[in-house]
Design a protein with these regions (language model features):
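Short, contiguous pre-domain boundary segments
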Residues: 30-40, 115-124, 129, 140
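C-type cytochrome heme c attachment motif
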Residues: 54-66, 118-122, 135-144
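Post-cleavage N-terminal segment of exported redox proteins
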Residues: 2-43
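Active-site-surrounding "flap" and adjacent substrate/cofactor-binding loops of secreted or lumenal enzymes
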Residues: 76-104
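Electrostatic cytochrome c docking/interface patches
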Residues: 29-54, 65-84
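N-terminal secretory signal peptides
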Residues: 101-109, 113-115
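Thiol/selenol-based redox catalytic cores and closely related redox-interacting motifs
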Residues: 109, 113, 123-149
Length: 149
C-alpha cells in the first residue's frame, strides 16, 4: 500500500504553480515594428542623426576620437546630411595642425571638409594617461564592434 506524504505533495503543487509564470513569459512574442532603417533601402531619421552628432560634439568628443571619419561625411546621403555650408562651418570651427610650411615649421589653420575629425588627444599615451589608464574607443568604428553592426 502506498502512503502519501501530504507535505511533499503540497510543496510539489506550490512549486508547479510558482513556475507557471516563468513558462508563460517565455512564450510572449516581441512586438513587430517597421523601422525606417530596416533593409537595404532603409533610411535613418535625419534630425535624429543630427542630434546624435550634437551629442557627440558636446559630450563624447572630449574623450573619444572619430579618426576614420572626415568632416565631409556629415553631408553625405544616409548620414546627418548637413548642407555644404554647414559642413564647412563645422570643419572651420576646429584648428587643424598642418605643415610643414616652406621653413619646415608646423602651423595651424581652420579645418576643411576633407580633414579627418580632430582627436581630443595628441597621441594614445596622452589619452590613456588622461583616462586613468584606459584608452577611450574610437567612435567611428563603434558600430562595427557591436553584434549586428
Amino acid at each position: 500500500m502506498i502512503k502519501f506524504n501530504t507535505k511533499l505533495l503540497f510543496l510539489s503543487f506550490l512549486l508547479l504553480i510558482s513556475l507557471r509564470p516563468l513558462q508563460s513569459a517565455e512564450m510572449v512574442d516581441p512586438i513587430k515594428v517597421d523601422w525606417s532603417f530596416k533593409g537595404l533601402t532603409g533610411t535613418f531619421d535625419r534630425a535624429s542623426l543630427q542630434r546624435g552628432f550634437q551629442v557627440y560634439k558636446e559630450v563624447c568628443a572630449s574623450c573619444h576620437s572619430m579618426q576614420y571619419l572626415s568632416y565631409r561625411n556629415l553631408g553625405e546621403p544616409g548620414g546627418p546630411e548637413f548642407s555644404e555650408q554647414e559642413v564647412k562651418a563645422i570643419a572651420a570651427s576646429f584648428e587643424i595642425e598642418d605643415g610643414p610650411d616652406s621653413q619646415g615649421e608646423m602651423f595651424t589653420r581652420p579645418g576643411k571638409p576633407s580633414d579627418k575629425f580632430k582627436s581630443p588627444y595628441p597621441n594614445t599615451q596622452a589619452a590613456t594617461a588622461a583616462n586613468g589608464g584606459a584608452y577611450p574607443p574610437d567612435m567611428s568604428v563603434l558600430v562595427k564592434a557591436r553584434k549586428g553592426g
